[in-house]
Structure formats: C-alpha cells, structure tokens
C-alpha cells in the first residue's frame, strides 16, 4: 500500500504484477479546498530574506519548508538556526537515528520549522501543521500536491506558500490548472505589518 506512487514504481508494478488494483480516492492531484495557496514573486537573491520575512509575519507558524536538494536544505536550516529561528533539517544525508530524533522533536513541537527535501518528507504524518513553504517550486505537479497535502488535514485549514522567481510563473499556472484551484498572489509583508 502507498499513499503516493511515483511513475517509475507504477510502471514496474504493471510489468511484474498480475492484474494489480489501484484505488484512487478523489481526483488525482486534486487540490484540498481547506488549503490556501499563495505565491510570492521575488528575485533569486532575495528568496532567503523573503522566507525570513514570512516566518516573522506568521509568528505561530508550525510548518515544513521544502527545498530541492540536500545541500540547499542543510544551508537554509543552518541559516535559520544562525538567525535565531527554531528550525532543523531532514534529508537523506542524515542517519536514520538522526532523522528519528529530528522527527521526534518536530512532532512534539520542539522544532517550529522543519526544512526538508521531498524524499525525506515522503509519508510524513504530523498533526496540526499550519504552513507548508515551497522554497522554489518542484518540477512535478504531483510533488507540489504531496507537499501541500502535509497541511490542512482532518478538516483543518492550512496555508501553502510558494516563494518563486519570475521564471516560475508558468509552473504556477500549470499547477493551478491541474489542481483546479487559483493561487493568491501574495504581497510581501512590510516591517510595520510584522511588528
């Protein structure tokens, strides 16, 4: 059983399994209506500053920040910690014991922001996440729906934020079309709004 199945694995199952069954609940890649999708367009060099500003704007944030690579994940987590944020990282270069320890701290809310790769976050089941932040959009729409699906669970609301570069505008439109949901275009909070 798998909540999500990558295309590569699906093709292997079709090749080697006799008459496999697939159970789909709802439309594939359908957007959860309890999640508000917001994107912020920023210059590439301003992505980290935008992330900090958004974390400051939502002081009670309890969420996952998704990055594209292990290296980026660790760098962003290190910067956040250095800048005084309650954060840690989750990626494939950590031992299983380290991952378990980080997840234990995150589940009991001793960590406010978990910076993670898609692979490390597969199957994460954490209650009450308020936000998912995409530090850049994933290549696959299915990855986006998986990321945003970490919040807004069990009838609760959630916010999926994407910090994008102008070159990613087309990806936003593609995701909107596939999940059949329009994103809100966010305006970066001012210093006055944060204080």
What residues fall within each predicted segment?
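Conserved helicase RecA-like core
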Residues: 1-195
